[in-house]
Structures are given as structure tokens and as C-alpha cells.
Amino acid sequence: MKDEHNQEHDHLSPKEPESYQKAYACKEQQGEEKQEASEKEGEIKEDFELKYQEMREQYLRVHADFENVKKRLERDKSMALEYAYEKIALDLLPVIDALLGAHKSAVEVDKESALTKGLELTMEKLHEVLARHGIEGIECLEEFDPNFHNAIMQVKSEEKENGKIVQVLQQGYKYKGRVLRPAMVSIAKND
């Protein structure tokens, strides 16, 4: 058996064992290269994971910013509509005052005239429409409230106590609870 093994290697040149060494060295080098490639692959994977996480976080931030902007625009749009109604209401107040003045004059001339009745119906309809949109007159009962009333003058009154509303000089209005225009009133001062 030993002879067979020697016979197999007899035809090899003396340089061939050197080629085995080169092949072995080459194989070793390939192993090192594979290890380096594996390490590089690991580094690339790590780098990819980091970049992926950064991009994901950036996406989430941008998405959150977008949602916040969207909500703010919706709120701003809603507020703009609210203020548009308020502006229209403010522009209508002089018209309402004119109708009230016309009605007051018509009542003084003839309470039962068609003009007086027409003005009353017009005022009713106007107040219904305004109420439907959140615009209503300010109550001017007995108590003076500086949040809703503006005292223009003080007058003596036998029927009213000090500080009570005697007369409404100009109707006040509010829009959804906010004062558009305070009611102008006179209050009692009996001292």
C-alpha cells in the first residue's frame, strides 16, 4: 500500500509540493477574504439598519408634522368661517337699528297700520334668521351687567333702584355667547 502511494506521487515533479503549498496558501487567503467579506457584509447590514431607522424616524416626524399642519388648517378654516359670520353680523347691526327705528316711528304714527305690521313681521323674520346662525339680542332686564351693557347715562327713577337699567338706548347683540356690541343703557341714580 505504501508502494502504491509512492507510485502515485512518483510522477509528480519536485515543484508540485510547492504548488500544494501555494494552493493551501491560496485557500487560506480565500478563507480570510471570505471572513473579511462576511465582516464587511455585517458592517453594511448594520449601516443599512441605522440608515433605515433614521429614515423611518424622519418619516414619522414628517408625517406627524403633516398631520399637525392639517389639523391647524382645519381649525383655521373653521375659525375663519366663524369670524366671517361675526363680520357679517356686525355689518347687519346698523340695518337692524334702522328697522327698529322705523318700527318705533311707525308705531308712534299708527300702531295698526299695514306698514307697522309689515315692519313687525320683517323684524320677526330677521331675528329668526339671526338666531339660527347664533346671533341674538342681549337681554336688558333689571340688572346692569358690565359684560353685556354699556351705561351711557345715569337718570333719576322713582320705579328703579340705584344701578338698575332704566332704558335701553341701543340694542346689544352677541354671537355664540360673545358680545358683538354691548347694549347701550341708562341706569338709575337716585342719590
Curated annotation (Swiss-Prot):
PROSITE patterns: GRPE. It is found in: Cytoplasm. Residues 1-45 are annotated as: Disordered. GO terms for molecular function: adenyl-nucleotide exchange factor activity; protein homodimerization activity; protein-folding chaperone binding; unfolded protein binding. The keyword Chaperone applies. GO terms for biological process: protein folding. It comes from the Bacteria. Keywords: Chaperone, Cytoplasm, Stress response. Its main location: cytoplasm. Residues 1-19, 29-45 have a biased composition (Basic and acidic residues). GO terms for cellular component: cytosol. PANTHER family: GRPE PROTEIN (PTHR21237), GRPE PROTEIN HOMOLOG, MITOCHONDRIAL (PTHR21237:SF23). Participates actively in the response to hyperosmotic and heat shock by preventing the aggregation of stress-denatured proteins, in association with DnaK and GrpE. It is the nucleotide exchange factor for DnaK and may function as a thermosensor. Unfolded proteins bind initially to DnaJ; upon interaction with the DnaJ-bound protein, DnaK hydrolyzes its bound ATP, resulting in the formation of a stable complex. GrpE releases ADP from DnaK; ATP binding to DnaK triggers the release of the substrate protein, thus completing the reaction cycle. Belongs to the GrpE family. This is Protein GrpE. It comes from Helicobacter pylori (strain J99 / ATCC 700824). The lineage of its organism: Bacteria, Pseudomonadati, Campylobacterota, Epsilonproteobacteria, Campylobacterales.
